[in-house]
Amino acid sequence: MKTNELRDMTDVELNQKLSDLKSELFNLRFQLATGQLENPLRIRNVRKDIARLKTILRENELKQVRA
């Protein structure tokens, strides 16, 4: 997921994407615990995507305060 794509999304879309990624991370952790996870690097990528989303949401929040 590219940051430029995320910056073009609305806050509602970003929050929906964040919710989807959090549920995906939960499922990946569950699969890891049960030994069914095929690609453990996916957990790292999802965590980084969540961090990117939160960063952009915070940037948008600060833009609104300053405006």
From Swiss-Prot:
Keyword terms of this UniProt record: Ribonucleoprotein, Ribosomal protein
GO molecular function, one term: structural constituent of ribosome
Record-linked Pfam families: Ribosomal_L29
Alphabetical list of Gene3D superfamilies matching this protein: 1.10.287.310
GO biological process, one term: translation
Signal peptide, first to last residue: none
Family, as annotated: Belongs to the universal ribosomal protein uL29 family.
Protein's recorded name: Large ribosomal subunit protein uL29
